[in-house]
UniProtKB/Swiss-Prot annotation:
Residues 1-228 are annotated as: Alpha N-terminal domain (alpha-NTD). Belongs to the RNA polymerase alpha chain family. This is DNA-directed RNA polymerase subunit alpha. Pfam families: RNA_pol_A_bac, RNA_pol_A_CTD, RNA_pol_L. It comes from Trichodesmium erythraeum (strain IMS101). One of its GO terms (molecular function) is DNA-directed RNA polymerase activity. The gene is rpoA. It is an enzyme of class 2 (transferase). InterPro entries: DNA-dir_RNA_pol_insert, DNA-dir_RNA_pol_RpoA/D/Rpb3, DNA-dir_RpoA, RBP11-like, RNAP_asu_C, RNApol_insert_sf. GO terms for biological process: DNA-templated transcription.
Amino acid sequence: MAQFHYECVESKTDKDRSQYGKFIIEPLARGQGTTVGNALRRVLLSNLEGTAITSVRIAGVNHEFATIKGVREDVLEILLNMKEVVLKSYSEQPQIGRLRVEGPATVTADRFDVPSEVEVIDRSQYIATLSPGSILEMEFRIEKGTGYKAVDRTRDDVATLDFLQIDAIFMPVRKVNYTIEDAHIGSSLEQDRLIMDIWTNGSYTPQDALSNAAGILMSLFEPLKDITNMADIPSGETTDPTSQIPIEELQLSVRAYNCLKRAQINSVADLLDYSQEDLLEIKNFGQKSAEEVIEALQKRLGITLPQEKVAKAT
């Protein structure tokens, strides 16, 4: 199998610490340039984990359409500015950042007080302008995730604490382009040269982004290396196909889905280990959510969970 190599031929960092990198990957067999380029592009834009501010609590404010005395921006504008802040978290757990500024002042992300596990990438990001005597005091929730996360009005953990939610953009890669050229290797022209242009928000270098995307693709395809011909499986080892269905197929509400995920319930097979009583013991999982899961299993798959806990043999 022919080997290829890659090279970073151009890189730069802008004033806001966003970064750009240009990579050449060659030689690839004819047609593989498009295959590799498209797969990497999709993963770079959708699957890399990033960090974002997901909610904000501002002293004296209880809704996003309010104004703050002595602050030029209204609350909605402040939230939009907070949405643009670029962070990098080294912790898997949500973190809380704080800000308290007295006017007169121009407030930027440089004023943030964040945990040691969190790095502010662009400290010049503008937040608000304060007049003399005014005070802007807030707390904000920092989370890791992938893709785009819309406001979830059902989240009790933030709603009950007066946090105003923000549509979070976790994507660390802002843009990806790729082109295919002929690779002139020796006398053969039947090979591809893949050229990739990657722009990031600064929380990843383009090199790290490309490396992580390749790792995700490798882990995705790794199980396919061990595919066994179904004809070779002994008849006594058949598996109920419905048990392998992911819980996403049940089309549950966001609240019920998130509770199941936090409890490490990822498939119907995992759910079958629970009785109806067991569901109610899941953290933040109420009667309404339990009924929703029970109904979805019955209507979509014809599966009925036992009412009571099943005694396990010792």
